[in-house]
Amino acid sequence: VRSRRQRQMCIRDSLKAKQVLALLPSSNLEDSEIIDSDDMSRLIPAIDAADVDALVAALMDGGASIELYAAYEPSVRVFMGRMGGHSVGVVAASGKLTAGALQKAARFVRFMDCFGIAVISLLNTCGVTVDSVNAQGWLFKAQSQLLFAYAEATAPKLAVVTGDAIGQAYVAMGGKANADITYAWPGAVISALTPEAAVAVLYADQVKADKDLSVEEARAKYAGEYVEKVAGAVNAAKDGMVDDIIDPAKTRAMLISALEMLGSKRDSNPPKKHDNLPM
């Protein structure tokens, strides 16, 4: 006999499944239904990039979304909903990402691509992390799977760098080799290295030579210089790493405009028996 809690969980899961099915087309050969329900040019309020729930709610039509795999690897969160009436999937990456988080994102992207649903990546991550030396191999495999999932996906792929985009996560989720369009908020930092690591590699001589400051102060000084001159959003735009620097309040409107533009996208992969998924 099922307990009351088990019955409630079954009802909740059934309702969530029904909501997910309502967002999916009948097959990959059909477009998902477009439902007009919200102002497409609506501005979003000032939101901390780290507040994923508030940001996703502000972007979605009516503030409504469905989170999938919520109990697993919270450094990557994945949602489904509508934006400008279009069915979309959202991958929100924040903090340091584990191998499990990368695999969670890869699985979700492949699920969205099965039905040709656009994927929007929200990036505010300072790189990847491992719990132990033994997990290093798992991390490499997970990174390969994430890159594979984004590279193979033919559905529209948009990215917004809301904070930091450091290392491999940016390359897979928001890099111009994979994303159709990448936007950045003005304060974004986009780099292969963290500012602290960049100082250790690129500014070691300057830190030693700066006798007017302590070592910690000199490191902080050159970390700020690295962000300003190399890793900031303006320099990323100049180098073609992002397509545009946008007003955060207009993020929803810019994404919907991009979805409308990419609505007729019909991409295909080269003919072959199957892709060689990194196992």
Question: What is each residue range found by the language model?
Answer:
Residues 1-11:
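Single conserved hydrophobic/aromatic residue that forms the stacking wall/gate
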Residues 8, 14, 132-180, 188:
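Phosphate/diphosphate-binding loops
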Residues 12, 95, 125-126, 162-163, ...:
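Short, ordered loop/turn segments at secondary-structure junctions
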Residues 12-56, 246-275:
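Terminal amphipathic helices with adjacent charged low-complexity linkers/tails
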Residues 101, 118, 139-143, 179, ...:
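Generic long, charged, amphipathic alpha-helical segments
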